[in-house]
Design a protein with these regions (language model features):
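Short aromatic-glycine-(Arg/Gly/Cys) micro-motifs in beta-strand/loop hairpins
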Residues: 1-20
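Compositionally biased regions
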Residues: 9-11, 21, 38, 51-52
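Short, well-ordered helical secondary-structure segments
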Residues: 3, 11-12, 29, 34-36
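Short, mixed-charge low-complexity intrinsically disordered segments
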Residues: 31, 35-61
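Conserved aromatic
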Residues: 24-27
Length: 61
């Protein structure tokens, strides 16, 4: 079973940040949520919820 989450960034910046702490079980649902939730000037990306991505985006101080 794969799980997914969404990160976002301003089109003017390089770094993605955690968008929401919601976890999705379908990539399609995560992408749709990201598309409908983004403001103009932002882009989103759907990522696998794994230890590498978790450490990179969730454990940011």
């Amino acid at each position: 079973m794969h799980l997914y989450f969404i990160v976002f960034k301003s089109k003017k910046k390089d770094d993605y940040k955690l968008f929401t702490n919601t976890i999705f079980d379908k990539e399609k649902d995560a992408d749709e949520f990201g598309r409908k939730s983004m403001k103009r000037g932002y882009e989103h990306k759907v990522l696998d919820y794994n230890s590498e991505n978790h450490n990179r985006y969730w454990n940011v101080n």
